[in-house]
Amino acid sequence: RNVTPDSTKEYETLGIKEGMQKWPDLPRVAYVHMLQSQGLLHDTYVYGVDAKKSLTTIINPTETMDGAIISGNCVSACDKNTTYHHQNNPVVADLFEQHGKTINYVCNIITNENVYLADKMRSSDWTAKLCRLLDLDGVIVSQEGFGNPDTDLIMNTKKIEAEGIKTVIITDEYAGRDGKSQSLADADPSADAVVTGGNANQVIVLPPMETVYGHLEFVDTIAGGSANNIDAHGNITVEIQAITGATNETGFNYLSAR
């Protein structure tokens, strides 16, 4: 508490009207932050409320830095957001870097990823409705998880694009170990601006460690593992989906491409 930091940075978002008056010529951009809410260890909490029990709503970007969103996830580790990811979201950081320069960063819109189709339809309807009410010019959408939430991602994208709002999505891929399979479980021509966090089915070999905390007998049954994936020397062959944050869909990794 009494230590002086090496550097400080101040972040600020203005009210809707104030922002429009201050930057009338800058495109209005928001971040649609999808939250895992399938249940059974696929959970997220916003100010203590289970995300699956709430409707799509607006949140100030700086609130996420202060711990408003808490993770309750532990399944398929590669593309689940930990609380640390929420607090240090690179999408929020990068949007703030451009705020007042090339864009007017209006707000975050948080929406859930419930299992049932009726819930998906309701949440995506609300997402598109809020984007329209805010008179946005552009939106960045980040997914959390894969498979079932691919439908939420595409429904959000289709409906936001249908409002005439340019949309970019951030996701990851399950394209098979050879990278030749369809990357998402759902697709639509309107989702034509995509940033990928990588292929979760990519296989790596983890060398043996001198000290292991935990239980090795489960490495062949966790998501990303396979039968007999530990050899006689202790090497573990596993898909990167077993590693927390390996294909994080906020871009919190070191993956790059040229």
Residue ranges, per PLM feature:
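An N-terminal assembly and electron-transfer interface module characteristic of large anaerobic redox
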Residues: R1-R258
